Amino acid sequence: MDLTVEPDLNSLITSSTHRWIFVGGKGGVGKTTSSCSIAIQMALAQPEKQYLLISTDPAHNLSDAFGEKFGKDARKVTGMNNLSCMEIDPSAALKDMNDMAVANNATGSGEFSDLLQGGALSELTGSIPGIDEALSFMEVMKHIKNQEQGEGDRYDTVIFDTAPTGHTLRFLQLPSTLSKLLEKFGEITARLGPMLNSLAGANNVDLVGKMSELKSNVEKIKEQFTNPDMTTFVCVCISEFLSLYETERLVQELISYDMDVNSIIVNQLLFAEYDEGDSCKRCQSRWKMQKKYLDQIDELYEDFHIVKMPLCAGEIRGLNNLKKFSQFLRKPYDPVADSKVIYELEQQD
């Protein structure tokens, strides 16, 4: 029996069970291009399904990649009926939270009401470390709740264009961290529930009930994130020492979280030995270095899908260019037969 792992993402792209796909790695290795490519190929392969691509990176690039503006509300990609994009904006989300708090306390008086009216809540929460990851996590919870209750837009799969590795690991730790915190909170509320509810204010907010509901939602997410049929992580790297080192750290962390990870996209490969005519010495030298680390990647991750993507002559921006580039996620790039594609990318204004 042939146990060779295919050097493509066909099994993921045609998957009928995955609900959450995370795409991440070191900064500057092509995470956004890779996440856009995966989302496009999934949408093309299964036109009857709806897909949502979310950027959780504070330095949003989805709008730049597609050449059209996306915001905090999901919007269809022009030219694709089953792919939507959104960029989670922490500052806008915090403003919404502050406005909601002001509205709920509009009849209140005193220092707390004045604090809210002054926007101090958003200023305070905006400075909390990890707030970007927490807001992204809230977005995940919102989608799970909407799908269970049949509210809002329904998406079969959500693809995350994540922040660089450190932010992403904090995001993925949130289910376990929140679960532990809420367990402790549960112990406290068992004794002090009525008192806590009375402290929630005159608006009759059932604080204990809200926390209990939050705990239930967090447990559902934790369960789904550790189910390999529902969630997977695609690592993105380039063939250099620092990127390889960070990829290995990321893989080990994901394994410790019981998350499925079995795919690596290696971007910006030169394939210089296949260049027509005399290739420049710098390209040949760099390709020699890339091959050295490619060999290490193949050896380290022999049971992974290793997808080797070429360095293109132009920018991979706009839907048409992304479609051309993303085809190599399904059909491995052939440096001889496919070399002209990397020179055919359309110029974007």
Curated annotation (Swiss-Prot):
Compartment list: Cytoplasm; Endoplasmic reticulum; Golgi apparatus
Main location as per UniProt: cytoplasm
UniProt-annotated binding residues for Zn(2+): C280, C283
Source species, domain of life: Eukaryota
Keyword field: ATP-binding, Cytoplasm, Endoplasmic reticulum, Golgi apparatus, Hydrolase, Metal-binding, Nucleotide-binding, Transport, Zinc
GO biological process: tail-anchored membrane protein insertion into ER membrane
Active-site residues from the entry: D57
InterPro entries assigned to the protein according to its UniProt record, in alphabetical order: Anion-transp_ATPase-like_dom, ATPase_ArsA/GET3, ATPase_ArsA/GET3_euk, P-loop_NTPase
Family annotation (CDD domains): ArsA (cd02035)
Binding site for ATP: K26, G27, G28, V29, G30, K31, T32, T33, E240, N267
Principal EC category: hydrolase
Pfam families in the record: ArsA_ATPase
UniProt EC number: 3.6.-.-
GO CC terms of this entry: GET complex; Golgi apparatus
GO terms of molecular function: ATP binding; ATP hydrolysis activity; metal ion binding
Keyword Zinc among record annotations: yes
Leader sequence segment: none
Function: ATPase required for the post-translational delivery of tail-anchored (TA) proteins to the endoplasmic reticulum. Recognizes and selectively binds the transmembrane domain of TA proteins in the cytosol. This complex then targets to the endoplasmic reticulum by membrane-bound receptors GET1 and GET2, where the tail-anchored protein is released for insertion. This process is regulated by ATP binding and hydrolysis. ATP binding drives the homodimer towards the closed dimer state, facilitating recognition of newly synthesized TA membrane proteins. ATP hydrolysis is required for insertion.
Family of the protein in this entry: Belongs to the arsA ATPase family.
UniProt cross-references to HAMAP family, sorted A to Z: Asna1_Get3
Subunit annotation: Homodimer. Component of the Golgi to ER traffic (GET) complex, which is composed of GET1, GET2 and GET3. Within the complex, GET1 and GET2 form a heterotetramer which is stabilized by phosphatidylinositol binding and which binds to the GET3 homodimer. Interacts with the chloride channel protein GEF1.
Name used for this protein in its record: ATPase GET3
Recorded name of the encoding gene: GET3
